[in-house]
A protein has these predicted regions:
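Short acidic low-complexity segments
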Residues: 34-45
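Short, compact, well-ordered microdomains
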Residues: 79-97, 102-106
Length: 123
């Protein structure tokens, strides 16, 4: 499977990316999405990708979550093995946004992505 397949990207989706610094990935998203934004999250996004390089960046997840479709997923993409940001902090940011974690994917050689969705009661 490609990274895009592991992340659940399908043609025709509404996709948003918030401060994600991966030009090739953003180009791929633009090519597959029905609607795409890399500035602010689109309402009813099927997928939202939030980039976080340090713990303070995790607040972006809470700001982006209200734009997520009820059956959508929010991915937090963060550096692997860095002191600036730990997995537990990423998990807590998703929880504070009202989401539950369901999956982890190796996004690239340097970054990991954690997937969050709305709890079943909110879908």
């Amino acid at each position: 499977k490609t990274v895009s397949e592991k992340l659940g990207i399908k043609p025709g989706m509404v996709i948003s990316a918030v401060v994600l610094r991966d030009a090739d990935f953003l180009t791929d998203l633009r090519g597959q999405a029905r609607s795409f934004s890399d500035s602010k999250p689109l309402k009813h996004s099927d997928l939202i990708f939030v980039g976080a390089e340090k713990a303070a960046d995790l607040a972006r997840a809470g700001k982006a979550a209200p734009s997520l479709h009820s059956a959508g997923a929010l991915w937090i993409v963060y550096p692997k093995g860095k002191r600036e940001i730990k997995e537990q902090q990423v998990l807590e940011a998703g929880k504070q946004a009202g989401l539950v974690d369901v999956k982890v994917v190796s996004f690239s050689a340097t970054h990991t992505a954690l997937k969050f969705v709305w709890p079943k009661a909110k879908r």
